[in-house]
């Protein structure tokens, strides 16, 4: 295996940064090279709802949710690196996607 791309996303950037540091430490222990973490643009989803269930169209409330994303590239990955990545315990709030690149 030559290169692995790890995409992470979470609603809380502190939890995401902690997960990235855990991953990079595990990769560095195996001797592989780490590129990143590369911060990607934060997606902001906004929702506007009426406060009243019946009337008062002018009275509205707005909510937003922010999705923070990071990319970590692993160069010169060995089977030991993959084993270490599979054994990691990350926070359940963090969505992790792992892809093998050529």
UniProtKB/Swiss-Prot annotation:
Any one Gene Ontology BP term: translation
Q: Spell out the subunit comment.
A: Part of the 30S ribosomal subunit.
Molecular-function annotations in GO: structural constituent of ribosome; tRNA binding
The family assignment reads: Belongs to the universal ribosomal protein uS10 family.
Cellular component, GO, one term: ribosome
Alphabetized PANTHER family for the sequence: 30S RIBOSOMAL PROTEIN S10 FAMILY MEMBER
Protein name, entry field: Small ribosomal subunit protein uS10
Q: Which UniProt keywords apply?
A: Ribonucleoprotein, Ribosomal protein
**Top-level division of the source organism's lineage:** Bacteria
List the InterPro entries hit by this protein, alphabetically. Answer: Ribosomal_uS10, Ribosomal_uS10_dom, Ribosomal_uS10_dom_sf
Q: What does this protein do?
A: Involved in the binding of tRNA to the ribosomes.
**HAMAP family listed in its UniProt record:** Ribosomal_uS10
Q: Which cysteines are joined by disulfide bonds?
A: none
Q: Is Iron-sulfur among this UniProt entry's keywords?
A: no
Q: Which organism is it from?
A: Nautilia profundicola (strain ATCC BAA-1463 / DSM 18972 / AmH)
């Amino acid at each position: 295996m030559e290169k692995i791309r790890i995409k992470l996303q979470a609603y809380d950037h502190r939890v995401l940064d902690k997960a990235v540091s855990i991953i990079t430490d595990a990769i560095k222990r195996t001797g592989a090279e780490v590129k990143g973490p590369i911060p990607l643009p934060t997606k902001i989803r906004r929702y506007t709802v009426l406060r009243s269930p019946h009337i008062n169209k002018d009275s509205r409330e707005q909510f937003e949710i922010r999705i923070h994303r990071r990319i970590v590239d692993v160069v010169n990955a060995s089977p030991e690196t993959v084993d270490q990545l599979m054994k990691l315990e990350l926070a359940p709030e963090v969505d992790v996607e792992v892809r093998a690149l050529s």
